[in-house]
Amino acid sequence: MPKGPKQQPPEPEWIGDGEGTSPADKVVKKGKKDKKTKKTFFEELAVEDKQAGEEEKLQKEKEQQQQQQQQKKKRDTRKGRRKKDVDDDDDGDERVLMERLKQLSVPASDEEDEVPVPVPRGRKKAKGGNVFEALIQDESEEEKEEEEEKPVLKPAKPEKNRINKAVAEEPPGLRNKKGKEEKSKGKAKNKPSATDSEGEDDEDMTKEKEPPRPGKDKDKKGAEQGSEEEKEEKEGEVKANDPYAHLSKKEKKKLKKQMDYERQVESLKAANAAENDFSVSQAEVSSRQAMLENASDIKLEKFSISAHGKELFVNADLYIVAGRRYGLVGPNGKGKTTLLKHIANRALSIPPNIDVLLCEQEVVADETPAVQAVLRADTKRLRLLEEEKRLQGQLEQGDDTAAEKLEKVYEELRATGAAAAEAKARRILAGLGFDPEMQNRPTQKFSGGWRMRVSLARALFMEPTLLMLDEPTNHLDLNAVIWLNNYLQGWRKTLLIVSHDQGFLDDVCTDIIHLDTQRLHYYRGNYMTFKKMYQQKQKELLKQYEKQEKKLKELKAGGKSTKQAEKQTKEVLTRKQQKCRRKNQDEESQDPPELLKRPREYTVRFTFPDPPPLSPPVLGLHGVTFGYEGQKPLFKNLDFGIDMDSRICIVGPNGVGKSTLLLLLTGKLTPTNGEMRKNHRLKIGFFNQQYAEQLHMEETPTEYLQRGFNLPYQDARKCLGRFGLESHAHTIQICKLSGGQKARVVFAELACREPDVLILDEPTNNLDIESIDALGEAINEYKGAVIVVSHDARLITETNCQLWVVEEQSVSQIDGDFDDYKREVLEALGEVMVNRPRD
């Protein structure tokens, strides 16, 4: 049988046979030979193994060289030599890149119009966009945002290297073909961005290089990997040297703001060491303010004050009219004292013709008698007296020209009231509690509180245009407060007072300045009038807030988002404001309207637990005589008792023994004769004027109550909160609390003791007005006995206390009310009581 045609062999034996495929990359079927080289499969394998071994050897040598280079660069970095080399290399690369970008860019005039220009056939079209000019323009911005750009650009670098790496590994023919296609695509673009231009430049530079020779691809790959490692190493060193590399953008901005504030504080320290913790800014003086520079009124607009990084005043306005008496009120710690200090130091723009005095420091302790310390405050009078003495000496020597000058000096002395100066000084000192012997006593023999009274007497004697008093009643007894209250009601110059004594503010002030929300708000009338107006204002604000919230709720129900609803509401407020502004064209522009916030009332409530009933008398002194060693007795034959419903206020001048009487009642002092008797079940709660001595300063308020009364943590915090201690202060060491906060801790301790009798020695010191009101309400609701020593007239009158006067070594009850006692005190000093009606 004839044989059929011979079967054709299968299709091409070579896999991947193409234009750019090297013989080494061809795959041969088992048992076949290459028609060109006539090599067997095993010979091909041997050749490949040999080439692979050589390449592996070269690769190892390259890696060793790279490791040596990296170690050398690390050593150079330690020695500080590497930075110069890197900068030189970077400068060279940057110059090459800039020259390349300059060739690709067009003039700036072409960049403005960007009208496409027809290109003649056969010519290349210039690339659009002036990349070089754009880089020059943004160079400073890129330097500023270098830290922010790094996280964005870092992932792009490996991608760029991968592109170059892929181009290097592609066959030469395919790479050239692909490069032509990419080049033609680049011509079709009119306005490439700076990033695209950089990419095209990298590709063009890659194309211009010679095609890689066999066996060089891996070398190039290794070199590129080495350069990539160097770049990553540089970035790692930058991050290691940058202490803020781990911070986010928000944290960096916050840190920058804090550093700016610290620099501002440092500059302020250099300028004025007295105000080293404060920052003040004030708007430029307007034309209206410039007109008032020579007037007696003060008008400061748009000033801001910050202390320790905390903003106290923001765009606030200060208006003070000559001859008015202002009371500055507001919660503790909001900047009232800071404002007084800035006015006194003229950190704010006070008119130069207004002399300002802030009474805040006690007089120097020296040999100067108290009355002379007051008289020497009037430097003009002292200068005239010295001139008088000098001219009298010249006149005695026969100088006739001195007579005319001496007459002028006498006229000035009469005009200033120099003859009555000493009588005036002694009257002021007597009103503040100095008897004739004390007025002639050297100041170094007085305590700090009495030297503070001398300082207050100096301020009253000088009568500045603007007198500022910061808590003037804190160092005074009730009698001195009564005299000062009456004296200031006749003050004819401008007065600015910070005080927590509501009765004092009601009697003295004609206007109230309320510090609220970092601004100053003004009310005509005394504190009682302000309180009514403020409460009415808060009610109106609450109604407006509820109306606003209702409108926002309706807008949200209609499909608006919260942001859209708030924006629409603000637009309505803006239109209303513009309408009002058109009606009142004379008024200055107001701040842009903001959405209302819920009004928050500052409320404090004190509570003391009611005691169980006890049979009277629960406490008393019987036949008691007491005196300190080496001194005459303070009391002789005291005999009185106290019941559970007693409300007693002990009054009298300083030094007569009011605090000593309280210590005898509590059993802390033992009588010289007689005895203190009390019910065996009686528990006494004592608030000492030196209350800080009974606290453990290293403990927190919560720990102090937990240890003393075995209270759970939450119960201790609730007790502290009831007496107005802020929650953040519950876990702070007591030594770091303010005086008012420490006082609240003591009141919380008294409540935990569940006393049957409250004995309070000057409890209103360091308390604000709201807390004093809360204390008065708590005393009225308390079912036990109360004995109090206080200089706060309103606390005395609000609690309906009986007045017991300490005088002449005994204690006696007054027939009449508090006004009767005031009249007696003023008559004893030779003063006439001012009966100014309260508004």
UniProtKB/Swiss-Prot annotation:
ABC transporter domain boundaries: 298-542, 619-834
GO molecular function: ATP binding; ATP hydrolysis activity; ribosome binding; translation activator activity
Pfam hit, one: ABC_tran
GO CC field: cytoplasm; nuclear envelope; nucleoplasm; ribosome
InterPro entries: AAA+_ATPase, ABC_transporter-like_ATP-bd, ABC_transporter-like_CS, ABCF_EF3_subfamily, P-loop_NTPase
Positions of modified residues (Phosphoserine): S22, S105, S109, S140, S197, S227, S589
Sequence positions that bind ATP 1: G330, P331, N332, G333, K334, G335, K336, T337
Biased composition (Basic residues): 29-39, 71-83, 247-256
Superkingdom assignment: Eukaryota
Location of this chain's protein in the cell: Cytoplasm; Nucleus, Nucleoplasm; Nucleus envelope
Coiled coil region boundaries: none
Region (Disordered): 1-258, 553-600
Job of this protein: Required for efficient Cap- and IRES-mediated mRNA translation initiation. Not involved in the ribosome biogenesis.
Protein name per the record: ATP-binding cassette sub-family F member 1
Organism: Rattus norvegicus
Organism lineage: Eukaryota, Metazoa, Chordata, Craniata, Vertebrata
Gene: Abcf1
